[in-house]
């Protein structure tokens, strides 16, 4: 009986790998369709490692907790805390919905672009141009 108990204890100490469950929504992706179940689990585990969404969510909650703490200490008002939280929520919505736009306008060659901006503002008219106009008007 004692030997059997020792064997069971040895089996308990063996580290077990966590079971990776691939969600059904991921099964239909083109990357995982041709793979068998073990390959799908392995690939999904890699996808989870490189997913930045949990880090973003943790950063957002940390920022919200920081806002609440500053409000409790009296550094900011409740209205300010709510406005900051709304800005955070709206910016994350825009960032998640943003798709890289396609560039349709061809870039100019380096010879066509200005290397240094003009020193004069746009509204300044050169005196020589004004004097030429006056000469044309006088004739």
From Swiss-Prot:
Which InterPro entries does the entry link to?
FAM216
Show the Pfam families listed in the entry. FAM216B (PF15107)
Q: Which domain of life is it from?
A: Eukaryota
Q: Which family does it belong to?
A: Belongs to the FAM216 family.
Which PANTHER family does this entry report, sorted A to Z? FAMILY WITH SEQUENCE SIMILARITY 216 MEMBER A, PROTEIN FAM216B
Q: What is this protein called?
A: Protein FAM216B
- What organism is the protein native to? Homo sapiens (Human)
Which gene carries the instructions for this protein?
FAM216B
């Amino acid at each position: 009986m004692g030997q059997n108990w020792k064997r069971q204890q040895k089996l308990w100490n063996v580290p077990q790998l966590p079971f990776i469950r691939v969600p059904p929504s991921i099964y239909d992706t083109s990357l995982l369709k041709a793979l068998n179940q073990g390959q799908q689990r392995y690939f999904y585990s890699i996808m989870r490692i490189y997913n930045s969404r949990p880090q973003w969510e943790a950063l957002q909650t940390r920022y919200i907790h920081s806002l609440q703490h500053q409000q409790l200490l009296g550094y900011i008002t409740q209205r300010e805390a709510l406005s900051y939280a709304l800005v955070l929520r709206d910016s994350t919505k825009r960032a998640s919905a943003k798709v890289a736009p396609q560039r349709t306008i061809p870039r100019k060659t380096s010879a066509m672009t200005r290397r240094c901006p003009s020193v004069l503002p746009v509204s300044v008219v050169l005196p020589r141009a004004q004097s030429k106009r006056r000469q044309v008007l006088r004739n």
